[in-house]
Design a protein with these regions (language model features):
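Basic, alpha-helical interaction scaffolds
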Residues: 259-298
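Conserved pre-catalytic core of RNA-dependent polymerases
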Residues: 1-168, 207
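Active-site palm subdomain of RNA-directed nucleic acid polymerases
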Residues: 56-74, 99, 175-205
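Hydrophobic alpha-helical membrane-association signature
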Residues: 90, 177-181, 217-220, 291-294
Length: 298
């Protein structure tokens, strides 16, 4: 029965409209409860649709992997890639450069609501460019179009709101669709500038011994600005940071959209605290502090 429904949906490329509706439940994080920014939206979607999504996602991922589609610098939501493998790859680059006498500048990029603002028309073009056509393309087009959601707070339920952009939050296919969307970004980065992604988390870095090499990183930020403009995303300059590694690494100014990138002495990179000396003292101290706080509860 269920398999017949799935087969009919894939053959016709049409998903029941109710399957494209989601329920948003705001989950309180911390801070002032009257401030909406202190809530994390949890999106609940149709269970039956999620089963079908998982089947399609597995086959689609295999197709893309077999065709070597995914950029080697993307580590998010992919088999045999993770935050750990990304950090290991990054640290290998950093340590090798420092041992060779280079200093390193790293820019951490923050996109504003990246998953929610993906333009559907551009996403569809990229899906097609990835070699995805026929019934699967028709299904994906229907899946990401004409979606709506309601918000539930306590026993109160809002009316329907339509979504006009973004990959479906809370869905199984959403992360994969975003990877397809952002996959071409690393190709725009010059070869001498390092780039690492974990889904929408992006960092750019350059090893340098002179100002000319550092200027290349500033030019790369301009390339990134142009890419975001062409692809309908926005960078949040106030949430971007610059970290300077190496002995006597004189700080220089980097700019995004005419605004200076904030400098930092320590930053959380995929859960790991990295400081200017790559000593990991801050991370070790954080672990010790958390252990002391949790020990009495054991």
């Amino acid at each position: 029965m269920v398999s017949d429904i799935f087969r009919c949906i894939i053959d016709n490329g049409q998903i029941p409209q109710i399957w494209k509706s989601s329920l948003i439940i705001p989950l309180y994080k911390k801070g002032e409860k009257s401030d909406p920014k202190n809530y994390r939206p949890i999106s609940l979607t149709c269970t039956l649709c999620r089963i079908l999504e998982r089947i399609i996602a597995q086959q689609l991922t295999k197709f893309l992997e077999d065709n070597k589609f995914f950029n080697k610098n993307q580590f998010g939501f992919l088999k045999h890639r993770s935050t750990t493998t990304q950090l290991l790859s990054t640290m290998d680059d950093l340590y090798n450069a420092i041992q060779d006498g280079y200093n390193i500048d790293i820019i951490y990029i923050d996109f504003a609501k990246a998953f929610d603002t993906v333009p559907i028309n551009i996403l569809l073009d990229k899906i097609e460019s990835a070699g995805i056509g026929g019934r699967v393309y028709t299904f994906l087009k229907n899946f990401i179009s004409d979606r709506n959601f309601k918000i539930k707070i306590g026993d109160q339920l809002s009316h329907n709101y339509e979504t006009f952009s973004g990959v479906p939050q809370g869905s199984v296919l959403g992360p994969l669709l975003f990877l397809i969307f952002i996959n071409d970004l690393p190709n725009e980065i010059p070869e001498n500038v390092g780039v690492k992604l974990y889904a929408d988390d992006v960092k750019l870095y350059i090893a340098h011994k002179n100002g000319i090499e550092r200027e290349q990183l500033n030019k790369t930020l301009g390339i990134l600005e142009k890419w975001t403009e062409l692809n309908g995303l926005e960078i949040s300059p106030s949430k971007c940071f610059a970290l300077y590694l190496g002995k006597n690494n004189m700080k220089r100014e980097y700019n995004i959209h005419g605004l200076k990138v904030q400098e930092t002495e320590c930053i959380r990179d995929l859960g790991l605290l990295i400081d200017t000396k790559i000593s990991f003292n801050n991370h070790i101290n954080m672990i010790i502090k958390n252990a002391y706080l949790k020990a009495p509860k054991l």
